[in-house]
Amino acid sequence: MKPEKHSFVVDRRSFLRQSSVAAAGLGIGAIPIIGAEKEKKKPEAETLVKTFYDSLSEEEKKAVCFPFDHKLRLKIENNWLITKKLVEDYSKDQQAIIKEIFMGIHSEEYAQKVYDQVEWDSGLDGFEGGSSVAIFGTPGTGKFEFVLTGRHCTRRCDGDSNEGTAFGGPLFYGHAADSFNEKPDHKGNAYWYQAVRANEVYQMLDGKQREAALCGKSRGEKGRATVKLTGKKNGLDGIRVGDMSGDQKGHVRKVLADLMAPFRKKDSKEALKLVEAGGLDNIHMAFYKEENIGKDEIWDVWQLEGPNMVCYFRGKPHVHAWMHIKKPV
């Protein structure tokens, strides 16, 4: 696993993109094209995975393609490259397909924000120089999975090849926005809104409930073991959602919705369906007082865990988030 790093130098590519965004905000170049055709529907990410696979040379396939059941497929870390071949090592057309796959597995609302986060956290390397991909199985002929990794990024596209598994397997996302050691307000962090919502639940709890929800130290980060599912309905960290009032439960649902918001609708819908199958009441919500930034009682580290799901949000020193959801056993 590569050590965490951060660069505060804005590369030319990022600068140009930010400049174009600023220009758009000022109305520059915003004149509509009369008679422009309606934008064609974009191909599904799974279709693009096959297109990308078909474009690979035999040499490239040897470097980045593996059997579907290869142990590397379900590996997860906070900062790693799944193969040695970087995105920038592919042809420009292939790079464009990879980016389109990445954008396609995220929601329209968040896709650009998430891409910008990965670009930023990759420093001078950018998305192309800081990311790598692998394909497991053979797209178009059976089970397959496309995996893209980098700093603060493990994303999957499997076309539902992994039945009963949300997002094709465990996910990781994160962001070091303003600095490696973020301040309590996590200025500019793409995912801090999720913690804000979670802390709203804490504020709704009464004294006894807060006592149950507040814990010492969290599970910490241990690669794939971080998202190991226990199958337990009781004895987990924090307060059981089944012990909450109706309005408190409703806010937990909002937390879950926020956790799913960055991802495309069909994947988020499947994930929430699996969470409900395990029983909302069986989920436990925990906040970790020994890992907080500042003394504001806005908890930076928290989690939701049930028998068939875990969403671990580690907001210190910056945001790392781990998610794994499966069909209940």
Which positions does each model-derived feature cover?
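A cross-kingdom marker for long, charged
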Residues: 39-58, 62-329
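Bacterial Sec-dependent signal peptides at the C-terminal "C-region" and cleavage site
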Residues: 30-39
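Detector for intrinsically disordered, low-structure N-terminal pre-sequences
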Residues: 8-9, 20, 33
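N-terminal secretory signal peptides
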Residues: 1-14
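N-terminal export leaders
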Residues: 12-28
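Low-complexity, intrinsically disordered short peptide segments enriched in small/polar/basic residues
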Residues: 5-7, 28-31
